[in-house]
Amino acid sequence: GGAMRKNEVKSLLETRDAMECLCLRLVCEKNDVAELEKLSPILDSIRDARNADEAAERVFSFHHELAIMSGNVLLPLLYYSFKTQGEYLWSLYCKRSGVKKLYEIKLALFSTLMNKDIDSAIEQTHRIMDVAKNDLGFYGA
């Protein structure tokens, strides 16, 4: 537990940005719309989360499932290695911006994947990570 230092948050965001872009590219290449639809119940669970911590856990599940769908056997392990820190940051974001906003961000990402629009998925990911990196004071001590 406890707050993460700014340099730790920045490093985590940079690493997640790279991992996530690889993951999204592989997911788009290897999965059809029917496979991607399997993410819908996880998205619904994010929308229906009762609090920030619950939403953060469900967002982790969403990204972990994407990592599994990527077909890269290391990506789920890497995501899991950052589980505690990732959930901490998502929870902070939720407490600040609300569950609805976090859900909308993940829904937008899901929509780009369903449309096989990898460029938009990657651009969204870079933009979200950049916003977080520019707000390190909020996320890190």
Q: Which residues are covered by each model-predicted region?
A:
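Residue-level marker of positions within ordered structural domains that often coincide
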Residues: 28, 71, 84
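Secondary-structure boundary/capping residues
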Residues: 32, 36, 75-76, 91, ...
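Amphipathic alpha-helical packing segments from all-alpha helical-bundle domains
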Residues: 54-58, 73, 77, 96-100
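Short loop-to-helix capping motifs
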Residues: 71-73, 116-117
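Short alpha-helical scaffolding segments that buttress acidic/His motifs in well-ordered protein cores
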Residues: 23, 78-79
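C-terminal all-alpha effector/ligand-binding and dimerization domain
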Residues: 43, 81-141
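All-alpha effector-binding/dimerization core of bacterial HTH-type transcriptional repressors
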Residues: 1-65, 104-127
